[in-house]
């Protein structure tokens, strides 16, 4: 390892927390914002396909559970392995960190092949289960048929990018996402409109973009500039290391995989009470929610290597400072977006559709659904901090609590207590937000105080 690389890694434990958090979080936030373009740009263009944009947009929304599940499996291994590698670096165990990287890479690729085969075989019944109607199923299948062929590229770019951030190279990690998202933005109109491929064109553009992102990640992790190098000798599944990574990655996996269950619950209930138009509105609401969630995740990812390194080095004062700054920045951002959405909902919705009937229904739903959206700052900030500290069990519980224990039951139960069934379905979101934020904040403050006191 070069002297410069040693200095870059050591900075995680010595540089002033404020400037370091800004330096690491800005690229990861930028990466998440740009990553948002992958899905949002597709939706914006698809929603404007002549004559069929409304149904095509709704059909694409039905594919979200599959797309989310692929990302969740990447997180299971990648977001579990990267903090483990960062903790190993903090403890000066560089060889162990590289073995973690090799194990996670082998596992990601094996899992990608399995998922590709399963989704190709069972996509039609799955999409019907997820809320597709006879009108929207053809559009959903057109997109998903091609998208799943790029599963290995998604697993590589999403699953391994955290290992770049884990060594303090968040600017390189940012480029992984920027390269793919910019390319996707450029290719979408070409394939959708110029080549007249419609929904299929959006899928092709996404696959090409993800392949380029994956190539960028592999080029860096096998090159000379990396502290954690992907070595052929370590390219095998070490079961104890994989179990350790999966144990920690279970929380982000549950966070994302339960998003699939959540989408199914929403889609099925909305299809029952409002038809395709209500499902189409939910597609837009999901996009707006991602505008808040993904940057918050990027901020937490920027803070993770600093917090993990400080934990490994047993620096409680530094750990407290990281958590304080992370939470303050998260709240300011989340509150700002919440205010903008509540004040200018028509402007936000018009980004995705020009269909006035869909616009009006979505604006009404958005104000209800996003009523307490700013509480995501507490949920994401504290839950991801538990991941950085290696607290797998608590993080997993918090990941399950909001969606599985609160939100999904509320989606199914609340309509029985309201005359306006659609209102009740959308109301489930802010009710769950309030309860989850209170629980997450309380648990983190209690456990974090204990961890730092015992050091």
What are these language model-derived features?
Residues 31, 35, 39-46, 71-78, ...:
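Alpha-helical transmembrane segments and their lipid-water interface positions
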Residues 23-42, 146, 180, 209-213, ...:
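Transmembrane helical elements of multi-pass membrane transporters/channels
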Residues 18-37, 41, 66-73, 110, ...:
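Residue-level signal for short hydrophobic patches within transmembrane helices
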Residues 57-117, 154-173, 279-339, 343-345, ...:
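Small-residue-rich hydrophobic transmembrane alpha-helices
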Residues 147-165, 176-181, 202-215, 297-300, ...:
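Short runs within selected transmembrane alpha-helices of multi-pass transporters and secretion channels
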Residues 33, 37-58, 127-134, 190-197, ...:
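Helix-terminus/linker motif at the lipid-water interface of multi-pass membrane proteins
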Residues 1-28, 85-152, 194-250, 307-372, ...:
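Short alpha-helical transmembrane segments in multi-pass integral membrane proteins
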Residues 54-65, 140-144, 203, 276-291, ...:
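Small-residue hotspots at the loop-to-helix junctions and early N-terminal turns
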């Amino acid at each position: 390892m070069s002297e410069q690389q040693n200095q870059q890694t050591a900075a995680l434990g010595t540089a002033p927390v404020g400037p370091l958090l800004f330096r690491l979080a800005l690229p990861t936030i930028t990466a998440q914002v740009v990553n948002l373009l992958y899905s949002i740009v597709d939706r914006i263009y698809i929603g404007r396909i002549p004559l069929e944009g409304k149904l095509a947009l709704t059909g694409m929304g039905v594919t979200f559970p599959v797309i989310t599940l692929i990302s969740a499996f990447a997180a299971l291994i990648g977001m579990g392995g990267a903090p483990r590698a960062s903790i190993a670096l903090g403890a000066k165990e560089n060889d162990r960190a590289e073995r973690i990287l090799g194990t996670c890479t082998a596992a990601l690729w094996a899992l990608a092949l399995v998922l590709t085969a399963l989704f190709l075989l069972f996509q039609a019944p799955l999409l019907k289960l997820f809320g597709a109607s006879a009108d929207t199923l053809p559009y959903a299948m057109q997109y998903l048929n091609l998208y799943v062929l790029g599963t290995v590229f998604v697993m590589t770019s999403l699953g391994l990018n955290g290992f770049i951030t884990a060594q303090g190279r968040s600017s390189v990690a940012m480029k992984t996402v920027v390269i793919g998202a910019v390319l996707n933005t450029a290719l979408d109109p070409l394939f959708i409109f110029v080549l007249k491929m419609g929904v299929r064109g959006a899928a092709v553009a996404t696959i090409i973009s993800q392949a380029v992102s994956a190539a960028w990640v592999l080029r860096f992790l096998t090159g000379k500039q990396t502290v954690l190098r992907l070595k052929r000798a370590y390219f095998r599944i070490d079961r104890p290391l994989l179990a350790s990574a999966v144990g920690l990655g279970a929380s982000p996996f549950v966070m994302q995989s339960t998003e699939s269950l959540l989408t199914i619950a929403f889609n099925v209930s909305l299809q029952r009470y409002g038809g395709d138009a209500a499902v189409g509105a939910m597609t837009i609401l999901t996009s707006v929610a991602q505008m808040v969630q993904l940057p918050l995740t990027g901020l937490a990812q920027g803070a993770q290597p600093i917090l993990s390194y400080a934990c490994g080095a047993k620096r409680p004062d530094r750990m407290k400072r990281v958590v304080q700054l992370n939470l303050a920045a998260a709240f300011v951002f989340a509150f700002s977006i919440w205010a903008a959405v509540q004040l200018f909902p028509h402007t936000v919705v018009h980004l995705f559709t020009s269909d006035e009937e869909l616009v009006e229904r979505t604006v009404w739903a958005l104000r209800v659904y996003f009523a307490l959206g700013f509480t995501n700052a507490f949920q994401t900030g504290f839950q991801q901090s538990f991941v950085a500290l290696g607290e797998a069990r608590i993080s997993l519980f918090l990941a399950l609590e909001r969606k599985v224990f609160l939100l999904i039951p509320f989606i199914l139960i609340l309509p029985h207590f309201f005359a306006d069934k659609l209102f009740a379905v959308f109301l489930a979101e802010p009710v769950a937000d309030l309860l989850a934020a209170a629980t997450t904040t309380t648990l983190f403050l209690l456990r974090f105080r204990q961890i730092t006191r015992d050091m």
